[in-house]
């Protein structure tokens, strides 16, 4: 158990060879986080090795989203250390490795320009940016993004604007984005939020394939609903 009632469970592990520092995807040592003198997290320790699938489970309001921010390089601890894919948070430019981290979260969803095309919101994961700026992407990049959209049943969203999407549609766009760059660390924060029954079934079926993967990718799924943990994580 982590701080504040967050339960960390390692549901699926596929590792080979000798365990060493090179096998660690994420490590939190004595992490604490305070906001305006309020203690949000205290003495959090967690080690996730490559190829492991973890579920962080607990009710809303106990610090799960704060943990997600730190694990995805978008927040810093008040005390303690966070090592992500061999990089010490705060010591290395996060943009040098952020595209190796796939993130789906409501907070990230609010970072896109309102008129962003969902297709661009997905493909820009390759450069870890939110918004089409000066970066260029290939036809193959867009083909992969469209393939992910089909897998999650949202191909019809191409050409629309992010601010016009429903919560469930935005959630599926963010999951596609998280998978776009074949990340070494995949973090899915409440990946079924806002989904209707049909969208939920499509998403859980696709995420079950992620859970069944035999690869070095580390996956962390954050949820407050046990019934929404995809197959392959149990």
PLM feature spans:
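Helix-to-loop junction immediately C-terminal to a conserved catalytic motif
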Residues: 72
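Catalytic Walker B motif of ABC-type/P-loop ATPase nucleotide-binding domains
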Residues: 186-189
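Conserved ABC transporter NBD signature motif
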Residues: 80-90, 97
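Conserved catalytic motifs of ABC-family nucleotide-binding domains
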Residues: 182
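The feature captures the beta-strand-to-loop junction immediately N-terminal to the Walker
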Residues: 57-59
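ABC-family P-loop ATPase nucleotide-binding domains
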Residues: 108-164
């Amino acid at each position: 158990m982590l701080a504040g009632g967050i339960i960390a469970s390692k549901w699926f592990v596929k590792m080979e060879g000798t365990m060493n520092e090179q096998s660690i995807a994420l490590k939190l040592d004595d992490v604490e986080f305070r906001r305006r003198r309020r203690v949000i997290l205290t003495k959090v320790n967690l080690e996730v090795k490559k190829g492991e699938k973890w579920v962080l489970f607990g009710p809303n309001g106990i610090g799960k989203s704060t943990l997600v921010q730190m694990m995805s390089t978008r927040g810093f601890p008040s005390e303690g250390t966070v090592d992500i894919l061999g990089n010490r948070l705060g010591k290395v430019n996060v943009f040098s490795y952020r595209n190796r981290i796939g993130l789906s979260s409501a907070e990230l969803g609010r970072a896109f320009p309102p008129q962003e095309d969902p297709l661009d919101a997905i493909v820009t994961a390759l450069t870890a940016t939110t918004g089409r700026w000066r970066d260029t992407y290939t036809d193959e990049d867009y083909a992969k993004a469209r393939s992910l959209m089909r897998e999650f049943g949202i191909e019809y969203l191409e050409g629309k604007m992010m601010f016009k999407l429903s919560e469930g549609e935005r959630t599926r766009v963010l999951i596609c984005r998280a998978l776009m760059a074949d990340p070494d660390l995949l973090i899915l924060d409440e990946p079924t939020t806002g989904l209707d029954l049909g969208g939920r079934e499509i998403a859980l079926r696709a995420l079950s394939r992620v859970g069944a993967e035999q690869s070095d990718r580390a996956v962390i799924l954050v949820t407050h609903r046990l019934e929404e943990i995809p197959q392959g994580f149990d």
